[in-house]
Swiss-Prot record:
It comes from the Bacteria. Pfam families: AAA, AAA_2, AAA_lid_9, Clp_N, ClpB_D2-small. Belongs to the ClpA/ClpB family. ClpC subfamily. Residues 80-144 are annotated as: Repeat 2. Disruption phenotype: Depletion experiments (using anti-sense RNA) stops degradation of anti-sigma-E factor RseA. This is ATP-dependent Clp protease ATP-binding subunit ClpC1. GO terms for molecular function: ATP binding; ATP hydrolysis activity; protein folding chaperone; protein homodimerization activity. Residues 5-70 are annotated as: Repeat 1. ATP binds at residues 216-223, 553-560. ATP-dependent specificity component of the Clp protease. It directs the protease to specific substrates. Can perform chaperone functions in the absence of ClpP. Degrades anti-sigma-E factor RseA in the presence of ClpP2. The keyword Nucleotide-binding applies. Residues 479-670 are annotated as: II. Residues 425-460 form the UVR domain.
Amino acid sequence: MFERFTDRARRVVVLAQEEARMLNHNYIGTEHILLGLIHEGEGVAAKSLESLGISLEGVRSQVEEIIGQGQQAPSGHIPFTPRAKKVLELSLREALQLGHNYIGTEHILLGLIREGEGVAAQVLVKLGAELTRVRQQVIQLLSGYQGKEAAEAGTGGRGGESGSPSTSLVLDQFGRNLTAAAMEGKLDPVIGREKEIERVMQVLSRRTKNNPVLIGEPGVGKTAVVEGLAQAIVHGEVPETLKDKQLYTLDLGSLVAGSRYRGDFEERLKKVLKEINTRGDIILFIDELHTLVGAGAAEGAIDAASILKPKLARGELQTIGATTLDEYRKYIEKDAALERRFQPVQVGEPTVEHTIEILKGLRDRYEAHHRVSITDAAMVAAATLADRYINDRFLPDKAIDLIDEAGARMRIRRMTAPPDLREFDEKIAEARREKESAIDAQDFEKAASLRDREKTLVAQRAEREKQWRSGDLDVVAEVDDEQIAEVLGNWTGIPVFKLTEAETTRLLRMEEELHKRIIGQEDAVKAVSKAIRRTRAGLKDPKRPSGSFIFAGPSGVGKTELSKALANFLFGDDDALIQIDMGEFHDRFTASRLFGAPPGYVGYEEGGQLTEKVRRKPFSVVLFDEIEKAHQEIYNSLLQVLEDGRLTDGQGRTVDFKNTVLIFTSNLGTSDISKPVGLGFSKGGGENDYERMKQKVNDELKKHFRPEFLNRIDDIIVFHQLTREEIIRMVDLMISRVAGQLKSKDMALVLTDAAKALLAKRGFDPVLGARPLRRTIQREIEDQLSEKILFEEVGPGQVVTVDVDNWDGEGPGEDAVFTFTGTRKPPAEPDLAKAGAHSAGGPEPAAR
C-alpha cells in the first residue's frame, strides 16, 4: 500500500512519528496522523483544514487535553495502533472510489473522517469542524482541482467540475514563484546587468517569438538576470506590457519524477500549460533549457520541446531560458525549429571591477548569515585572486564562493569551544569515575569529597563557558584579505597568503637547504632559488610560469636530484614532483599522450599525462627528463606553456601553468667528456675548460632546438662535473640513508675518514658522475653489512664502525678491504645513532 503514497503522504507519516515522539507517546494513533496532515502544510488536506480554521497549535493542545503527555520518550520504532492502520486502509478505499491510483494527503484525511471514532475525529468535533463539513471541503477542493498529489502522480480523478482554482496549484507544485520571492525579499540583490535585463524586457515585449534565452558560461550570472527581472517587476520598473506579470521558474525534474505510465509526463506538462493559458499573466523561466530536448521522450512519445514549440511560436507562452554556450550549441542549435523560437541574449563574464561591486552588494547577506564582518580588502582580494588563480571557473561565481567559504571558516573557528573547557570536561569525568569507585569500595568520606570537587568543577566550567559565550561569541569576527588568501590556498594548493616570518627565513636560506642534498652546482641552486623567491614575493610575471630552466651537463651530476630536492623543499615530499620521462614520447603520435588524445582516438576521456596532473596540482615542479629524446612536435606544443603559461588539452580545457616551475634536463654536448682533449667539466681542471664545455653545450642546444623554444627559457644552466672532494662529501650524504635504515633496528653506523676516502676513490668516475658511487656503497657497505647482520656478528644496540685495512690512503687501494666492528652504545651518549646517521665522523668505538 505504501508504494501508492505520494511524497507528501509519506511525509505525513514521518511527521506523525515525530509528533508522537514530541508527546512521549509510544504509538502512532489517529491524532498523530491528524497532526502530521496539518504539520505538512502544503497538501490538499492541510489547505482544507486551514480553510476551516483548524490550526496545528489548536489540535496539539486538544490532543494533550484528551490524552496528555507520556512519561518517557519512546526509543526505536513506533508502531501504528489498529485504529491508525484502519485509517490508512480506508484512505486506499477512498482513493479507489475517487478513481485515483495514488494515495495523497486528501485521501488520508477522508480516511480519518470515514473512521469517525478515533481521537482525531473527537478533536475535529471539539474544534467546531463537523466531519461531514470537512469531507465536503475536501471534495470541493478536489472538484475544482483534482489534487496537488494528482499532478504529482500524473493521474486525475473522475469527473468533477472543470473550474480553475484561485491559487496556482500546478505551478506551485512544479515551480517557484520568483516574483513572490522578490516581494518577500528572499532574492539576493542584482548589481549591474542593466543591459541584459533591458534586452530581456525588449524580447518579452515582442508580439511573437517573445522568448529570450540567456546564454553564457557557468557562474556568470544568468539566473541572477532573471531574478533581477523579478525584482524589477515587483518595484514597477518595467514597461506596461510586463506590469503585474508573475515570473515562475519551472522544475523539469519534478515534472518527470514519478511519471510511471506512458502519458503521465505529457499530462502534467499540459496541465502546467493550461494553467498558464488560463492565468494569462505568467512568464515561465526554464533553467538548463537544453533539458527540454528529449525530456519525457520514451519510446513512441514526444519530448517536452515538441510540446512547447507551437505555443512558443504563436506567442501563447512566454518563456525565458538559460543555458551554457556548449549546451546551446550541442542541443538547441541542432533543433532549428526550437532555436528560431528563442532569441539569444549573451551574458558575458563581468570584469574584476564589476565583480567587486557585486560582492559589495551581497556583503550584507553573507555577513548576516555567517555573523562576521567582511572588509573591503576581502572583497578586492576575492575578485582579484579568483580571477588570477582559479582558471576553470568564472566570475562572479568563484569570487562569491571564496567570500562564502571564508565566512564559514571564520564562524566555525569562533564556534569551537576553547581547550580549557575540554580540560574541565575531562576533570569532571575523572572525578565522577573516582567517586563511583569510592562508593563501590564503601569509602563514603572520600566519595563525599569527590562529590564536592565535582560540583566545584561543574560550577567553574559553567562560569568559563558563560565568559566564552558572552565574550568571544559577541565579538563580530572580521574576514579580511588574508582569510581569503588562505581559503584560496586550501582550494588550489597555491600559497598566495602572506609570508610568515618563519617561511621568509626559510626562503632566504633556500640555497643552504638545497645544498643538504645537492653537492656543488652553485649556479643551478641559485637560479631555482631566485625563481621561487620571486614567485612567493609576488614579483613574477603573472602571465608566465614561475621559472623555466634547461639543466644541461653530464650524467650523474644532480640534474634530476635538484628537481626532487626543490619539490621536497616546497611540498615536503619528493613525490610532489611531476616527472615526465621524455624518452617515452619519441614518436609523433605519442605527443597526444602528454596533452590528451583528440576526439575519436583511444584515451580521449582520460586526459593527458601532463595536463591532468598540472590541472589538479597547479603549484608544482614539472621535470621533463631528457628533453632531447622527445619528438619535435612536443617542443611546438610547449611554446605556449613557456610564453603564456597555459595549454589547451585534448578536451578543450585550458590548463594553467602560471604557478609551475618547469625544468628540462638534457645530456646534449656531453658525449666528448671522456676524450682527453681538455674538455672535461672538472673545476679542478680549470675554469677555462668549463667555459669551453659550456659553449659546446650551448652550440649543441642551438642545433637541436629551435630558436623560439630556447628564447622562451629563463635560464640554461650547465652543471659542473663532480670533483673528488665533492664525491667525498657525497659519501656522507649517501651513507646517511643507510644509517637511517639501521637506526630503525637500534643500530648506528660510523665511517672513518679512510673508509670514506676509499669509497670515493672506488666510486669516482668523471664520465658517469655520482651513480657509480651509489653502486660502490651498495657493493662494499650494504652487501657486507647485511651478511654480518644475518650472521649476528653485529646487532641491535651496537655502533657499527667501518674502517679500512691494507691501505695507507695514497695508492690505488686494490688490496684494501673494509672492516666492520660492532661495539655497545655507551649509555651516557644515547645520541650516537643520530650522530652516525649524519655520518659526521661520530665517536670512535673503544676497541676493535
